[in-house]
């Protein structure tokens, strides 16, 4: 079958299927594209000829559409993958940040970018960055640091090797992440006689690797000796779809469950085992459990510093760590007893072997008091009378007004901590906070990807994205993409006049507020952005609201078929307090007394760190 490289690539993608909700669907359901001279005539032409089998959506910004691809795969629990294609040069490098988001969060995304000519005859070509000492190097090599699999296709027949490697990387529960293929412009249109069987339909299944029996036995021994065990639920618990197994395990053995940002919505807030968020963006009641626990059972968690309080949170000198993870690298961190296997299967196996084991009764009973304290703290902090509403008050109102079917999304700035603390999960897999890479702009673009996931799979409910004014200004153009594609999204734009959470970081560590708030300008009257007018200019239904009118306007937005943007002024310095120690770089040689005090607090905090 004589095909060009581009035609063969698209044909192969179309043949890849997966079973999802008892239906066979495309593993690559669509592509995001911004076409330029590096991909329009080769890959672009092949996509156009197959526009029904693999629809192509046009983005406005390469980073934005790639972030949408990341959020799509997250909403689909890594069971489907979007394709992203760009031209060469700036179009390609614009995707590097989004690739890093996928890499940090262990999420699949396929990136296909144009490259220079393999023949080198027309060099240097438009948008080529020349390396005088390495003619084979192009800017596409920058993706090596932010992808799980990287290749440059120099001959059409190389697809026979690289595409199977690509698909296995995207499907691998342990090594899942972004894949990058560089496609030289001349190679895109070169032909080869491909074997027909290469394009036969394949229905994939994501593997559930079982743990080694010796690691299970060792973990059983440790758990049985523990009096105060604590489970930390991470994102891997969700991707394994271990929701009911985790709940059953925790409640059967009387173990509290605290959650990371990625693990939120594994358990419902109504689950008796649920005890709130842990770590730097967590709450004091949950962190107290972590401090006292003699055993940490990490389920699908990569144990980031925001989870572990920069490894100062687990204060019990006798504590041990068991880590359940498909990825060896994550499972073995900090000398943990590693259970390298699927979370769902591992919990079932552990549960079947623990017999009559129970956590210490007084420890199990703490679950009730901890939950009560978490809920009481939410009520207390959201009842305060303020001149402008706090993030917490806005989050609580949106939470109460949302349905069980709705999906909330956020990313960088102060909102992750506020949602992590004040959002009570009503249904499983209904929460997405991108805090693996904490990428500003994900809130806008990611919501588009999540909406595509919801709408393509026929799920009820709305995608509600909470975004700060700083993130909005950084990357907002995919609002237009969502409008033009007919998607339905609600954006809650919280305007606190700048990067207020970084101002908080500055001032709480002795520094002065510097270039974080928009009024810190050399102009007497810096410009205030009219966010309502801006969103309207991209076709969104936009309104300025207050805390008092927000519920009514949210109801109206939920009945609107398109994109809505509700703008609300929020307090720049009222935050949810609590959390854990976080190591940051504070000068040890400053003459400023406040910075000296902050440095001393850092030294004191780091002294509590355990292996």
Across the structure, where does each feature detected by a protein language model lie?
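Thiamine diphosphate
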Residues: 120-134, 331-332, 340, 347-348, ...
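Active-site diphosphate/adenylate-binding microenvironment
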Residues: 29-43, 371-457, 608-610
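Short alpha-helical "patches" and their helix-cap loops
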Residues: 26-27, 362-365, 460-467
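Glycine-rich beta-strand-to-loop/alpha-helix junction loops that act as flexible
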Residues: 233-235, 299, 412, 467-470
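Active-site-proximal structural scaffolding
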Residues: 250, 289-290, 391, 475, ...
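N-terminal alpha/beta PP-like core and its mobile active-site loop of ThDP/TPP-dependent enzymes
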Residues: 1-356, 397, 401-404, 460, ...
């Amino acid at each position: 079958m004589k095909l060009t490289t581009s035609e063969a690539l698209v044909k192969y993608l179309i043949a890849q299927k997966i079973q999802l909700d008892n239906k066979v669907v495309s593993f690559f359901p669509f592509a995001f594209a911004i076409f330029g001279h590096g991909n329009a005539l080769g890959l672009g032409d092949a996509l156009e000829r197959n526009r029904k089998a693999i629809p192509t959506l046009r983005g406005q910004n390469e980073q934005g559409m790639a972030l949408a691809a990341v959020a799509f795969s997250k909403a689909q629990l890594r069971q489907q993958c979007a394709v992203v294609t760009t031209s060469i040069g700036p179009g390609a490098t614009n995707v590097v940040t989004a690739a890093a988001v996928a890499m940090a969060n262990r999420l699949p995304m396929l990136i296909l970018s144009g490259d220079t000519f393999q023949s080198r005859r027309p060099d240097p070509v438009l948008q080529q960055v020349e390396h005088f000492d390495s003619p084979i190097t192009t800017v596409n090599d920058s993706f090596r640091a932010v992808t799980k699999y990287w290749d440059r296709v120099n001959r059409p027949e190389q697809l026979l090797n690289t595409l199977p490697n690509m698909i296995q990387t995207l499907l691998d529960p342990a090594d899942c992440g972004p894949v990058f293929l560089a496609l030289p412009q001349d190679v895109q249109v070169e032909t080869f006689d491909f074997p027909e069987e290469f394009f036969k339909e394949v229905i994939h299944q994501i593997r559930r690797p079982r743990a080694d029996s010796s690691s299970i036995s060792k973990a059983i021994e440790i758990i049985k000796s523990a009096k105060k065990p604590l489970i930390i639920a991470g994102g891997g618990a969700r991707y394994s779809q271990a929701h009911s197994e985790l709940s059953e395990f925790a409640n059967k053995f009387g173990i509290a469950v605290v959650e990371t940002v990625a693990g939120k919505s594994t358990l419902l807030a109504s689950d008796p085992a649920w005890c709130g968020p842990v770590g730097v963006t967590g709450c004091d009641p949950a962190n107290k459990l972590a401090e006292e626990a003699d055993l940490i059972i990490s389920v699908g968690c990569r144990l980031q510093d925001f989870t572990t309080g920069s490894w100062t949170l687990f204060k019990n000198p006798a504590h041990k760590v068991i880590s359940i993870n498909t990825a060896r690298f994550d499972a073995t961190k900090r000398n943990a007893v590693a259970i390298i296997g699927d979370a769902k299967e591992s919990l079932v196996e552990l549960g079947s072997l623990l017999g009559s084991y129970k956590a210490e009764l007084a420890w199990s009973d703490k679950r009730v008091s901890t939950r009560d304290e978490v809920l009481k703290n939410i009520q207390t902090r959201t009842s305060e009378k303020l001149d402008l509403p706090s993030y917490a008050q806005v989050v609580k109102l949106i939470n109460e007004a949302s349905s069980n079917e709705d999906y909330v999304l956020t990313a960088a700035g102060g909102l992750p901590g506020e949602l992590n603390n004040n959002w009570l999960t009503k249904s499983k897999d209904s929460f997405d906070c991108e805090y693996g890479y904490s990428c500003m702009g994900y809130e806008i673009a990611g919501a588009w990807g999540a909406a595509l996931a919801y709408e393509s799979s026929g799920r009820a409910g709305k995608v509600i994205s909470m975004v700060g004014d700083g993130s909005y200004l950084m990357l907002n153009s995919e609002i237009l993409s969502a409008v033009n594609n007919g998607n339905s999204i609600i954006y809650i734009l919280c305007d606190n006049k700048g990067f207020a959470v970084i101002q908080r970081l500055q001032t709480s560590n002795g520094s002065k507020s510097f270039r974080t708030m928009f009024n810190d300008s050399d102009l007497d009257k810096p410009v205030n952005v009219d966010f309502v007018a801006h969103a309207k200019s991209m076709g969104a239904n936009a309104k300025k609201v207050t805390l008092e009118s927000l519920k009514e306007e949210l109801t109206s937005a939920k009945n609107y078929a398109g994109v809505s943007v509700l703008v609300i002024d929020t307090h720049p310095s009222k935050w949810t307090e609590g959390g854990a120690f976080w190591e940051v770089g504070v000068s040890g040689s400053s003459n400023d007394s406040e910075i000296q005090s902050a440095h001393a607090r850092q030294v004191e905090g780091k002294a509590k760190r355990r292996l």
